Amino acid sequence: MSVTEMKEVKGIDQPSQHRAVDSHTLSEFVYGIITGMVVIAALVQEREDTWWQAFLIIVSGAVAVWMAHAYAEIIGERLALRRRLTGSDFARAMRNSWPIITSGFVVAIPALLPGLGLMSVETSLTASNLVGIVILALVGYLAGTATKESQMYRILLAVGSAGVGVAVVAIEYIVHHL
């Protein structure tokens, strides 16, 4: 797909193909972090899985969301471009959504620690949520850095981004305790 076609599909004006921060990749990564946190919150509240089951549930959830997201992108592109898509279009959509899986692995890493005898499964899932919240805060801060915001505004963006993670965990907690 050409750069012009990508602009039409995404509805944004991209200054170039090569940027220091790839906003699409970062947004997919954030999407995966939040999705992983939703799965983790459900695991903490509802189940008593082994550490390995918890890890697999988080990662397989990321894989399922990746597939759904890539498929939605493919359908959207077909409609926007009004043409049949090629195998390379399918491969690109899958590749562009890959950060969802990467982030699923990142938030699932603490779920492996009980296997080493370092903590309980419940504690590891809490640690996974904290990892997600910290990553969201870092993303918010770095977004402010990339747009040359003041230090105070960068901190505000970090707090706001972390707040999204806390809200996800809180909503899941409330839903599972009502």
Each language-model region and where it sits:
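The first (N-terminal) embedded transmembrane alpha-helix
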Residues: 22-47, 162-163
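Juxtamembrane boundary at the C-terminal end of a transmembrane helix
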Residues: 167-178
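Structural signature of hydrophobic alpha-helical transmembrane segments
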Residues: 56-67, 122-134
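Membrane-water interface of transmembrane alpha-helices
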Residues: 66-81
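Interfacial loop-to-transmembrane junctions
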Residues: 141-163
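Alpha-helical transmembrane segments of helical membrane proteins, especially in multi-pass transport
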Residues: 96-125, 129-133
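Juxtamembrane helix-capping/reentrant segments at transmembrane boundaries
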Residues: 83-99
